[in-house]
């Protein structure tokens, strides 16, 4: 059974491990292996958004809800991360820094129950290819909101400082489409 506070406590305890990243990956994998339990604890997603479950200078735990067909442009985290999907699908495109911006470096599709660890230098973009909300637990080895990061223009791949407000607008635009689709029915 997934209990939010126990999950948070387990992740905090994992920070004491020699390889905290690997320890957190195991905790996330165990949790998303029972997606209905996570849904029961965190609630059925109705809208896109980012819910902060825990935040400190060493650890951030988010419930990330990607709206239908939502795309978030290339960005980095500058800390390790573990992503676990408990509903839907997340397509990650990976990039490398180049002299003229980014170059493509592969992709990985995550489905319900899938988990992926991301190193602190990873640059990726995220797409929810489905017509439904994708739900994921994201755990970061630091303060996700206070760490200076970068984003890249999705067309030119030119680097710029990460704009949290712009990222949140992407979620809000997705919610506007969701609401419009609800009124069309």
What are these regions (language model features)?
Residues 77-97:
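Glycine- and acidic-residue-biased ligand/ion/polar-headgroup-sensing regions
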Residues 97-124:
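Short acidic-glycine-tyrosine-enriched beta hairpin
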């Amino acid at each position: 059974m997934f209990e939010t506070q126990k999950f948070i406590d387990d992740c905090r305890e994992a920070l004491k491990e020699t390889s905290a990243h690997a320890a957190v990956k195991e905790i996330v994998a165990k949790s998303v292996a029972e997606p209905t339990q996570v849904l029961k604890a965190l609630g059925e997603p109705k809208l896109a958004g980012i819910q902060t479950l825990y935040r400190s200078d060493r650890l951030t735990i988010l419930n990330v809800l990607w709206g239908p067909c939502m795309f978030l442009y290339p960005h980095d985290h500058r800390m390790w991360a573990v992503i676990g999907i408990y509903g839907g699908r997340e397509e990650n495109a990976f990039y490398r820094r180049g002299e003229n911006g980014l170059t493509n470096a592969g992709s990985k599709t995550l489905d319900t129950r899938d988990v992926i660890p991301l190193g602190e230098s990873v640059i990726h973009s995220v797409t929810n290819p489905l017509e439904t909300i994708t739900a994921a637990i994201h755990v970061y080895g630091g303060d996700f909101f206070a760490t200076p990061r970068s984003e890249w223009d999705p067309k030119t791949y030119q680097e710029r400082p990460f704009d949290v407000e712009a990222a949140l607008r992407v979620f809000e635009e997705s919610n506007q489409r969701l609401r419009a689709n609800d009124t069309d029915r």
